[in-house]
Amino acid sequence: VVGGDECNINEHRSL
């Protein structure tokens, strides 16, 4: 992963 979708998924998971 480039580091954009993962970041988004991580943020969504945290929320």
From Swiss-Prot:
One of its GO terms (molecular function) is serine-type peptidase activity. Keywords: Blood coagulation cascade inhibiting toxin, Hemostasis impairing toxin, Hydrolase, Protease, Secreted, Serine protease, Toxin. The keyword Secreted applies. Expressed by the venom gland. Its EC number is 3.4.21.-. GO terms for cellular component: extracellular region. GO terms for biological process: proteolysis. Residues 1-15 form the Peptidase S1 domain. Transmembrane segments: none annotated. Snake venom serine protease that selectively cleaves the heavy chain of protein C (PROC). This activation is thrombomodulin-independent. This is Protein C activator.
